[in-house]
Amino acid sequence: MASLIDIKQRITSTRKTSQITKAMQMVSAAKLGRAESNARSYEPYVSKIKDVVTHVASTGNSSDHPMLVSRPVHRTGYIVLTSDTGLAGSYNSSVIKEVFQEINKKHTSSDEYAIITVGRSARDFFKARQMNVVLEVQGITDHPIFAEIKDIASNTVQMFEDGVYDEVFIYYNHHINSISSELRKEQLLPLTEFHEKGKETDVDLTTYEFEPSEQEILEVLLPQYVESLIFGALLDAKAAEHAARMTAMRSATDNASDLISDLSLQYNRARQAAITQEITEIVGGAAALE
């Protein structure tokens, strides 16, 4: 049985840990509020640019744009959004596991895929296994701005246009609320949804006149749209990260409180046993003197 001193030391150290996790929980809660606001405020922009792309791409003259049309897939690109730090439950592991399993299932060679990582967790995991990481970025702030992701977003589009890969998927955690999120896999390129809408739409867009031409507009608009999708996913993932960390720290704080209660009970029992032992020894000694 542990001594009273050992138990007391464990209670003290657990209480200090509880104070740290409680503070981290409160910090994450504050960050979550702002992250949710950032994600919500960005949605109207993405929605509006999508409407514009839909109108332009639905014309017959622009349906053959290379970013809108599927082509034979020889190589697949994977964008993986994770965090730089842990202490966020399964936030990182769920995304990494999904991508890892997908690659192992679909590809037999590293020449058949390319990984783009955002966050140290994904980079370290895939590089430790000598997997094909072609682009990486770390140090994304808690409340990112587009400049932080612009290079990797524009390079993603450029590599597709250059034929480095023939399709691109993005994997991230979608924020639902403070206690739940869901893993999302979305196709970024090619933008076949607009090509299909162009075939299905009942709206006659031939009366629209474009200046400059539809192709010239799409040359600028489509890369911006894909970049906006990547940034929007990053904002969403950041909200999910803060929520996951807040939940993990709350759970850690609750577990620490339970452990302190158990240790306190154990301490009191050990102390009572020690006192009982001392009384027994005193009584026994007194009886021996009689």
Curated annotation (Swiss-Prot):
Keywords: ATP synthesis, Cell membrane, CF(1), Hydrogen ion transport, Ion transport, Membrane, Transport
SUPFAM superfamilies for the chain: ATP synthase (F1-ATPase), gamma subunit
Pfam families in alphabetical order: ATP-synt (PF00231)
Compartments where found: Cell membrane
Membrane association type: Peripheral membrane protein
Disulphide bond pairs: none
Source organism: Listeria monocytogenes serovar 1/2a (strain ATCC BAA-679 / EGD-e)
InterPro entries assigned to the protein according to its UniProt record, in alphabetical order: ATP_synth_F1_ATPase_gsu (IPR035968), ATP_synth_F1_gsu (IPR000131), ATP_synth_F1_gsu_CS (IPR023632)
Entry similarity comment: Belongs to the ATPase gamma chain family.
Assembly with partners or alone: F-type ATPases have 2 components, CF(1) - the catalytic core - and CF(0) - the membrane proton channel. CF(1) has five subunits: alpha(3), beta(3), gamma(1), delta(1), epsilon(1). CF(0) has three main subunits: a, b and c.
Highest taxon in the source lineage: Bacteria
Free-text function comment from the UniProt entry: Produces ATP from ADP in the presence of a proton gradient across the membrane. The gamma chain is believed to be important in regulating ATPase activity and the flow of protons through the CF(0) complex.
Gene Ontology cellular component terms for the protein in this record: plasma membrane; proton-transporting ATP synthase complex
MF annotations from Gene Ontology: ATP binding; proton-transporting ATP synthase activity, rotational mechanism
UniProt-listed PROSITE patterns: ATPASE_GAMMA (PS00153)
Protein name: ATP synthase gamma chain
Biological-process GO terms, alphabetical: proton motive force-driven ATP synthesis; proton motive force-driven plasma membrane ATP synthesis
Primary localisation category: membrane
